[in-house]
């Protein structure tokens, strides 16, 4: 079954497009079989060609595959929270999810704050509003469920007791330059340390909400597919001197606590920074290894996937090559807006957030981000790499309520 599934995914559709869905997640555990089996060859061929699968890292984690459900391209739920709430569960993983997501606009908070203390006061106010709005939504949908408006959900799900209320963030990178006590982006250690303080603070506050409302809350690196552009555009109109990504052009905010998209071509330099940030989220977060084109060999894809899992603690990652599709010639490696064989215009595919879409269809902000993006050079990925030493700021277990 696995072989047939992967072969279908590798083949793509009739025009050579990769399938955007489903997005399979493969668990990389300490006993993962890295031998040159037929299924491994197919898995990493699919990874090298289309970047389809996600990889969940359990090698440097205290979690087991049964502790997590990956709901989509971004949402990962820690089922240990359900055990703490209910005293145990059987099969609850298929009955969980998120009732809603609220994304906090960090650059605006930093821009308006007088100092770091004022930043946290303003952040708390926004988080309080987010938590209360999620509680109102939960109460509303539960009422509608009980009144019979969602009969199929009622039949198969039963209720929303095992669903999380999710709070996320956008623009940690731009919050640094807008903060008058920092004036530096996430490429600087001072802002990285500030980001750690912010994420820890948000986790602690979510724990308070769990006790206050009696519901499950989690912290997510929200994809912000349209939010990253929409918030930046509105902020720029209201506060002309606020700093966004790509000053002087189409404004956007960098997703969650990611580095500037044009910062480096060294994937390990980016991983070293992201490793201490992404482990602080209690819900979805992902590191996309953006590649200019498909890797030349499935073994190179396997080596890179293995190296990341064995040297880093970040929980979720992808290899994301850019590819193009010609209506006549089919799949083309890399970014080729015109087919080199027949001269027709093509569709160029890359991950907009968690899934692949033609870049010609992206919103203005994401299109600008794509133009600014540096792809990673991974030619030396097969050689051993020493990751940054473990730091005290790293945490992998979520805060419970």
Positions of predicted regions on the chain:
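Surface-exposed loop/turn and secondary-structure junction residues enriched for glycine/proline
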Residues: 105-107, 112, 144-148, 152-155, ...
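Intrinsic, low-complexity terminal and presequence regions
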Residues: 322-341, 347, 351-401
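Conserved phosphate/anionic-ligand binding catalytic regions in large, soluble enzymes, centered on
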Residues: 95, 159-175, 344-361
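Short alpha-helical "patches" and their helix-cap loops
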Residues: 182-197, 362-376
């Amino acid at each position: 079954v696995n072989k047939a599934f992967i072969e279908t995914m590798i083949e793509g559709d009739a025009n050579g497009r990769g399938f955007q869905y489903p997005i399979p997640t493969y668990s990389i555990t300490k006993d993962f079989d890295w031998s040159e089996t037929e299924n491994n060859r197919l898995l990493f061929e699919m990874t090298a060609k289309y970047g389809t699968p996600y990889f969940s890292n359990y090698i440097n984690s205290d979690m087991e595959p049964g502790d997590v459900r990956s709901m989509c391209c971004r949402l990962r739920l820690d089922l240990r929270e359900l055990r703490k709430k209910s005293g145990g569960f059987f099969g609850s993983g298929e009955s969980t999810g998120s009732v809603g997501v609220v994304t906090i606009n960090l650059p605006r908070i930093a821009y308006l704050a007088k100092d770091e203390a004022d930043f946290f006061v303003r952040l708390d106010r926004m988080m309080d509003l987010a938590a209360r709005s999620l509680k109102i939504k939960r109460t509303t949908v539960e009422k509608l469920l009980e009144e019979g408006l969602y009969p199929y959900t009622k039949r198969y799900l039963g209720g929303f007791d095992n669903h999380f209320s999710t709070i996320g963030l956008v623009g940690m990178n731009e919050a640094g330059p807008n903060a008058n006590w920092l004036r530096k982006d996430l490429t600087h250690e001072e802002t990285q340390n500030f980001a750690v303080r912010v994420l820890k603070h948000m986790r602690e506050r979510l724990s308070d909400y769990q006790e206050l409302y009696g519901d499950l809350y989690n912290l997510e690196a929200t994809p912000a597919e349209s939010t990253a552009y929409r918030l930046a555009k509105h902020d720029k109109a209201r506060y002309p001197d606020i700093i966004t990504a790509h000053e002087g052009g189409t404004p956007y905010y960098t997703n969650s606590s990611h580095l500037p998209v044009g910062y480096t071509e060294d994937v390990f330099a980016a991983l070293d920074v992201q490793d201490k940030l992404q482990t602080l989220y209690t819900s979805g977060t992902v590191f996309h290894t953006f590649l200019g084109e498909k890797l030349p060999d499935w073994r190179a894809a396997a080596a890179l996937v293995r190296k990341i899992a064995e040297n880093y603690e970040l929980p979720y990652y992808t290899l994301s090559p850019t590819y193009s599709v010609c209506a006549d010639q089919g799949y083309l490696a890399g970014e080729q807006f015109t087919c080199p064989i027949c001269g027709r215009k093509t569709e160029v595919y890359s991950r907009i957030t968690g899934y692949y879409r033609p870049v010609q269809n992206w919103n203005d902000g994401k299109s600008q981000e794509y133009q600014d993006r540096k792809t990673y050079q991974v030619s030396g990925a097969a050689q051993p790499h020493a990751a940054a030493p473990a730091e005290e700021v790293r945490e992998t277990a979520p805060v419970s309520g």
